[in-house]
């Protein structure tokens, strides 16, 4: 049975209210924005293989289906929609063991401006596998931002693949962050096809510790004339962690421009590899690359230590700056 307020309030399954409340409490504990659970927010709230909360707003249709081991959701944004609040995607798993698969099909119409705030909440995971497949199609002249933040326990194996299609004059900004909790085993892949004059920005930030294993792949196919892409990845690897980062940009369209930026810092016995792949098949296209890998910049360290910080404090401050944690 579904509880659906006549006033347009969040639809919550009665027999899953406790799980819903538990997720809200985790948001509070982690300092996340609990207003995202409000009635004015378009949202889907998932726990394991159940949809425990669902809310649509004018211009946004969210349809969810419970499937084996997970959930499939179709999210459609109409033309000419400008949402004042983000669309909230909450994927939770509150047990310590198991497997979860989520599939999101997202379609944005023309001339719309929307923001997605996605949280994956697996705080108690000890032996848990999570698979996420996301398809995002952005219509002409629409602007979309998608922020994906993760709260993990000690034992998460995660595979995430996102495919993005940008039509003429569309803009997409995607940010992935796993910096406050363990990665354990992470395979992250984002692939985008860019139409005429479309703009893509992808940014991934990951901190790997202990024996974590991280693989990041960002790919941009600049097919349309005057399309632009900026791919940026930051990986901080400690202890015995391993990381492999691949950034690919393909220049096909006239006057297409792409830039790849990789920053990887190694501390302890970590093993990090970064592979930039730039390919141009049009003499009017332009691709550039910037990379740094290895220890923390010595000049920055000395500068901070001259101000009274210890080596450890200076190192931590630089790392927090790279990860955007102030």
Swiss-Prot record:
One of its GO terms (biological process) is iron-sulfur cluster assembly. InterPro entries: Fe-S_cluster_assembly_SufBD, SUF_FeS_clus_asmbl_SufBD_core, SUF_FeS_clus_asmbl_SufBD_sf. Coiled coil: none annotated. Pfam families: SUFBD_core (PF01458). Belongs to the iron-sulfur cluster assembly SufBD family. PANTHER family: FES CLUSTER ASSEMBLY PROTEIN SUF, UPF0051 PROTEIN ABCI8, CHLOROPLASTIC-RELATED. This is Iron-sulfur cluster assembly SufBD family protein PH0883. The lineage of its organism: Archaea, Methanobacteriati, Methanobacteriota, Thermococci, Thermococcales.
């Amino acid at each position: 049975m579904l509880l659906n307020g006549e006033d347009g309030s969040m639809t919550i399954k009665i027999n899953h209210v406790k799980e819903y409340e538990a997720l809200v409490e985790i948001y509070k504990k982690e300092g996340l924005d609990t207003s995202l659970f409000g009635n004015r927010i378009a949202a889907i709230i998932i726990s394991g293989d159940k949809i425990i909360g669902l809310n649509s707003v004018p211009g946004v249709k969210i349809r969810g289906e419970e499937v084996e081991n997970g959930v499939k959701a179709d999210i459609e944004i109409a033309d000419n929609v400008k949402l004042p609040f983000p669309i909230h995607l909450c994927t939770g798993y509150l047990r310590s063991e198991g497997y979860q698969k989520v599939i999101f099909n997202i379609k944005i119409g023309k001339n719309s401006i929307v923001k997605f705030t996605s949280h994956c909440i697996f705080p108690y995971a000890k032996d848990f596998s999570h698979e996420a497949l996301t398809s995002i199609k952005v219509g002409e002249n629409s602007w979309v931002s998608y922020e994906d933040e993760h709260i993990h326990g000690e034992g998460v194996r995660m595979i995430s693949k996102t495919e993005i299609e940008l039509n003429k004059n569309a803009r997409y900004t995607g940010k992935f962050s796993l910096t406050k909790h363990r990665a354990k085993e992470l395979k992250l892949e984002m692939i985008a096809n860019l139409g005429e004059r479309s703009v893509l920005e992808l940014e991934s930030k990951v901190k790997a510790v202990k024996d974590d294993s991280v693989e990041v792949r960002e790919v941009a196919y600049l097919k349309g004339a005057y399309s632009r892409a900026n791919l940026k990845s930051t990986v901080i690897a400690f202890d015995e962690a391993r990381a492999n980062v691949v950034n690919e940009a393909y220049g096909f369209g006239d006057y297409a421009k792409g830039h790849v930026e990789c920053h990887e810092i190694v501390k302890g016995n970590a093993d990090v590899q970064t592979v930039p792949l730039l390919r141009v098949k049009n003499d009017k296209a332009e691709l550039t690359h910037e990379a740094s890998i290895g220890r923390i910049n010595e000049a920055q360290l000395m500068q901070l230590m001259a101000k009274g910080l210890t080596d450890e404090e200076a190192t931590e401050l630089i790392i927090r700056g790279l990860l955007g944690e102030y």
